[in-house]
Structure formats: C-alpha cells, structure tokens
C-alpha cells in the first residue's frame, strides 16, 4: 500500500538501484566471506599473493622482511660475542691492521669472534654489512668461533633469497598486463539505434597507445536476476550477447576507435525489450576486450559495464576519425559524445520485425507455361486458316468444274496458301490485331 505525501499525492517507492557487478574501471564488485583456511591458502601461493598485493603493502612486507632478518642475525652475532666474552674486553683495543691499529697488539690478549663488536649496536651494523655486502672492512669474523662463520654464511643465503624474491615480484608486478588495460578505453554510455534496418546495441572501444593489441577480440554478457521454471532464483544469471562470433566480427584491428555492434535479433536477450521496458529493466551488460600486449606477448583483459540507465535509446556516436592530407586524425574529445537520431522506433525489435509487412508481387508464369499458351493460340489460328483455305479451294474447284483430289486442285490450294502467307506477313508488318474469331478463341484458351 502506497503512502501519501503532504500534497495528497500518492508516493510510489523508488526501486533500489542495482549494484554493479563490474565497476566502470573493470574491477569486480565482489566480496568473499567465510573462506575456510584463507590465510593458509594464500600463503601456499605466496608469489601470487605478493603480486596481487598493492604496492604499499608489498613494500611494507619486504621492508619488514629485511628489518627482521637484520635484527635476527644481529641478535645472533651479539649472542655469540656475549658468550665468547668479547663484550668484556676493553673497547680501546684496536684490531690487527684495522683503522687506528698499529699491529702491536699484546700476544696474551684474547682474540674475539667478531672484531670491533662491543655491543648490540655493533652486532646489528655487522649484520647489515654482511647481508647487503657493503664491506666497510672495519668489522669482520675471525676463525675463533666456527658458529659465527656459519651464521655469516646463512645470513648471506637468506639475503640473496629475499633480494631475488623482491626483485622478481617487483618486475612481475610492473610487467603485469593488467596495467595495459588502463590505456584501453570504453565509452561512458552504450546506445541503441537502427543500423542497416535492424535495432542494434552499440558501444565504442579505443586504444590510447600506438602499440597494438594483438589478436584483440570482444565479448559481452547480460547479467540480470532470473527465476527458473522450478522456482530457483539466480541473482546473477549470465547470457551471452552475440557480437559476431560466427562470422568473425568479434575480432577487431584496434588501431583507431571502433564501435562494437550487437544485432538485436531473435537470439538476443534484448529482443522483446523496447524503450519503456529498457527504462524499467534491472540488468547489467558487461563488456570485455581481450588481447595480447605487443611488447610482452602477455594476455591482457579490459572490462567495463553498462547499466540499463546508461544505455541511450535512439542515439549514435559522433565520428572521431577524420581523414587529413597525409594521415588519419583521431579526436578523442568526441569519444564519449553521442547525438540523438530522429525517427528511431521506440518499440522492441520483436514488434519492429512483426510490423514489417512486405508485399511480394505475384511470380511471373514459368517460361514453359507461357510458351504452351502461345503455342495453343497459334495452333488454333493455323487450324482456322487451313479450314478457310480448304473452303476457298473447294469453291474455286467447284466453279472450274475440277474433280476433288486432282492435280489442278492441289495447285490452286498451294497458290492460296502462298497468298495467305503473304497476307499474314503484311499483317504482322503493319502490327494489326488478330481478327475477332482468333482473338476470341485465344481468350478462351
């Protein structure tokens, strides 16, 4: 039951706007919840986890890894020096051959495990110098403590592993084809208008770089809630929109902006949808552009989506490619602009198809029937002429007193036939109509 506002008008509650499944920038608006063993699964694939992590978090992780390793081995070196008694020695005793040393160290003085490490700060600095291979030459490990030598070897290996992992992750993250999708552009709106006599859904794609996308092809899917015949509710039912898979129109040469066309035919989910239905429908069209990056041969994918409110009925895109004197110019300031087309039908493609009444002319008679009718007419005309000639010959023969079947009668008949043929030729040359009797018989046929 609808409420009323203060003016007494009925208040119709507005339907909640549909959440995007795919955002305009291509990110999927999906949140995963209640995943069992999520941390263990992500740590099992630590490289992919680091590559997918944002830059700030990745740098924090590697910085923390370096600090932890330096602190751990610094504490280990301090512990070795402490138990060896190096920290109890006088800090003024110079190292053999070291800076400020004269090489005149007392032979009875104990030899430390790590030279010039007199506290935790010195051990930490030695750890940093060892792992980063700075090599100042002031602190060094002696052969007094094999444990300290082993610790130096282990720290060197750990440092190489961390460096390799960090460099590989950064390179993989920088070379990801996902960033190439940032220079692939989709129009802000999609349009529906008539093209080649049929309603078509169209949107525009473009490449902002001069480097090509190899084997570029497009796909489109319509996503909307769907209720099955058994009563099962599917909140995100996906249906393909044909953009020319069967004839290869889905593969494009993306040098300049191209308009992708989906013909709304009997197989299209938009076939029974008109302008009014479009404004009230709840669906989303996800468009996908895939191809290989020319520089790295890695597959990249760019995505975008259009809600029903972002589809303009009866509009077309403004042209962006213009032919100059020696080249073609692409004006990207017109990339998202459209203009309204007058006379675009507001009905659905189904209603438009049903309203087309095509009156086909009656097919002409086959050549065999035409010849047969003319043949009958000519045969009837020849029979009539032969009867008239025979009657005339009989009358002449009777007047001359000749017997039937004589040679003279046959000659007279041939003369009459010759005369009748001459008369017929004159009549055809003068394009005179046939006599009433032959015309009447022909019409009967």
Curated annotation (Swiss-Prot):
Disulfide bonds: none annotated. Residues 1-55, 170-445 are cytoplasmic. Keywords: Cell membrane, Cytoplasmic vesicle, Ion channel, Ion transport, Membrane, Postsynaptic cell membrane, Potassium, Potassium transport, Synapse, Transmembrane, Transmembrane helix, Transport, Voltage-gated channel. One of its GO terms (cellular component) is monoatomic ion channel complex. Coiled coil: none annotated. It is found in: Cell membrane; Postsynaptic cell membrane; Cytoplasmic vesicle membrane. Highly expressed in the forebrain, moderately in skeletal muscle. Im olfactory bulb, specifically expressed at the postsynaptic membrane of dendritic spines of granule cells. Pfam families: IRK (PF01007), IRK_C (PF17655). Changing residue 445 to A: Abolishes interaction with TAX1BP3. A motif (PDZ-binding) lies at residues 443-445. Homomultimeric and heteromultimeric association with KCNJ2 and KCNJ12. Interacts with DLG2 and DLG4. Associates, via its PDZ-recognition domain, with a complex containing LIN7A, LIN7B, LIN7C, DLG1, CASK and APBA1. Interacts with TAX1BP3. TAX1BP3 competes with LIN7 family members for KCNJ4 binding. This is Inward rectifier potassium channel 4. The gene is Kcnj4.
């Amino acid at each position: 039951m609808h409420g009323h506002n203060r003016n007494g008008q009925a208040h119709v509650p507005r339907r909640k706007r549909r959440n995007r499944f795919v955002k305009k920038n291509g990110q999927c608006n999906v949140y995963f919840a209640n995943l069992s063993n999520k941390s263990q699964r992500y740590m099992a694939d630590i490289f992919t986890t680091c590559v997918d992590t944002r830059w700030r978090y990745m740098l924090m992780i590697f910085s923390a890894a370096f600090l932890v390793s330096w602190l751990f081995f610094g504490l280990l070196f301090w512990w070795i020096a402490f138990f060896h008694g190096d920290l109890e020695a006088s800090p003024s005793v110079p190292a053999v051959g070291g800076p400020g040393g004269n090489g005149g160290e007392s032979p009875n003085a104990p030899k430390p495990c790590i030279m010039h490490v007199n506290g935790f700060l010195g051990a930490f600095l030695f750890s940093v110098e060892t792992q980063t291979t700075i090599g100042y030459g002031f602190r060094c490990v002696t052969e007094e403590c094999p444990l300290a030598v082993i610790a130096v070897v282990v720290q060197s290996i750990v440092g190489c592993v961390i460096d390799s992992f960090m460099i590989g992750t950064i390179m993989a993250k920088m070379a990801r084809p996902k960033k190439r999708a940032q220079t692939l552009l989709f129009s802000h709106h999609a349009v529906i208008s008539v093209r080649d006599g049929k309603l078509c859904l169209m949107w525009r794609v473009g490449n902002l770089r001069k480097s090509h996308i190899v084997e570029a092809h497009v796909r489109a899917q319509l996503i909307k809630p769907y209720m099955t015949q058994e009563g099962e509710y599917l909140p995100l039912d996906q249906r393909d929109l044909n953009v020319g898979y069967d004839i290869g129109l889905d593969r494009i040469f993306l040098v300049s902006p191209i308009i992708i066309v989906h013909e709304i035919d009997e197989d299209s989910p938009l076939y029974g949808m008109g302008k009014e239905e479009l404004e009230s429908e709840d669906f989303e069209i996800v468009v996908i552009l895939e191809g290989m990056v020319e520089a790295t041969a890695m597959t990249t994918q760019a995505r975008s989506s259009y809600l029903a409110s972002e589809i303009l009925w009866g509009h077309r895109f403004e042209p962006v490619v213009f032919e100059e004197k020696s080249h073609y110019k692409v004006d990207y300031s017109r990339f998202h602009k459209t203009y309204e087309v007058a006379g675009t039908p507001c009905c659905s493609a189904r209603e438009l198809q049903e309203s087309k009444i095509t009156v086909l002319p009656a097919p002409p008679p086959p050549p065999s029937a035409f010849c047969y009718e003319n043949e009958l007419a000519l045969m009837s005309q020849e029979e009539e002429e032969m009867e008239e000639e025979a009657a005339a010959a009989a009358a002449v023969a009777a007047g001359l007193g000749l017997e039937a079947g004589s040679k003279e009668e046959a000659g007279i008949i041939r003369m009459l036939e010759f005369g009748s043929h001459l008369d017929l030729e004159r009549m055809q040359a003068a394009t005179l109509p046939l006599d009433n009797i032959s015309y009447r018989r022909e019409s009967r046929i």
